[in-house]
Amino acid sequence: MPARAAVLAVFLFGGTSQEAPPGAGKPPALVTYELAESTKSVTPAGQRTVSALGTVIARDGHARWDLAHGAFPRSSATSVVTGPGGLTLLDAAAKASARATPADFADLFQGRPGVPGSAAPAVRDVSAVVKRDGAGRPFQDWPTARFRLEAAWTVVLSSPGRITRVKTELTGLVESAELAEAQSPLDALQRLLPARDEAREVLGAELSKLTGFPVFAELSITTTSSAETPGVPSGTEPPPRPLTARSTVTRRVRNLAIRAGARGDEALVAIPEDFHERGLDRILVGRAAP
């Protein structure tokens, strides 16, 4: 039986040992849902879309996300397993696993900052606010709460004879449902946002005010880059025109289902036993991990 069909059969009907032995605690509920995340960007260089779509199995704070097709950006990983103890990327074709940090996983979607040395980045003028904004749209049979997010920050890159300022402005809407059984580290919206250093810390602290399980999010990001050349007399040549890029980040949950837990469910959110652990650089594509 194919692995995906086997997982579906276990979810629908449970294992052969669905009842816990006398005196044992009740197994945690098992949750499945479809998760789609995408970032659509329009820049002076053109348009680009990065997306990930697949099925998530969540249990007791742990989760496994299996992509429906393809791999996560900048990697050969087709699945990710995550929980309170950490995060692991899985390459199904190679039967390989690699431990990673949440920042490593975020870098797959956002990319890493430029190599230090040629320019020294500094983050300035950071602000972030998350506010509750009443009730959101119902999600299946559950009510939701709506949150509004506003944030801004500026990254200053200094190099000999040139200063570049990159200002980022972010607005967004998040709808969440009180579904504790579905919650896991995969819910962290911070990994979808291009915030670095102090901006990431401030934004993360503000996003912690979001409650519940985020079933929908839409975030609009505008980035404006301008450059100046200190020491060059004004009027010598016109300054470069500012460059603007716009991105829309979405997260959407569909077809969520919950069933009673059964013995053996923990294997559905665990690293397969026949996978071999490798270094992270063996799964990343296009660059080596430090």
Put a short name on every predicted segment.
Residues 23-290:
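Extended soluble regions of mature proteins
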Residues 4-27:
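Bacterial Sec-dependent signal peptides at the C-terminal "C-region" and cleavage site
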Residues 1-5, 141:
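Positively charged n-region of N-terminal signal peptides that target proteins for export
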